[in-house]
Amino acid sequence: MEVSAGFLLLAAWLNYWDRQGVFPRVLLACTLHELGHLLALRWMGVPVEKLRVTAVGAELRLSGALGYRTELAAAMAGPAVNLVLAGWLSHIPGGVVGAGVNLVLGLFNLLPIGRLDGGRILSCVLALAIGPEYGERVAALLSVLCVALLSAAGIWVLWLGGNGSLLMVSLWLAVSVSEFGRKRGK
């Protein structure tokens, strides 16, 4: 496992400004999310070379390429962990914040955008349904469309209330989609 200095700086900064005690719950939810991916891969017999955690997310390095069905199952495992935890925590006294954190993390990761789990799920489903070439084209188009809609919503929210969080997230996703396309040679 490799943890970047950028992640450590971001974690320290977020923890410093966290007055509500939410950051430890977010960190735990993210850890369990990644553990869901790792356990799914291990259960399917896929060797994982490294887990790299950076300021912009976590990335698993595998020893080889995955088939579409294997990648689909592995991509679904992380959000599934968060959604199950959200349901469970919502029934526990004092668990509403943890439930909310897990619900938001699970649903966010299901957005059909590039490197997010939802983007990987969509790519795999489309590759199996209409073939890899057309599947990747459609998934890339939907990623760009989704980021554009989030960016427009972010601008609208910023204009209405002065909160730029959604716009910042959409810009991060735009960079992620751009990098994802370059790595795949698109």
Model-inferred region functions:
Residues 1-186:
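Hydrophobic transmembrane alpha-helices and their immediate loop junctions
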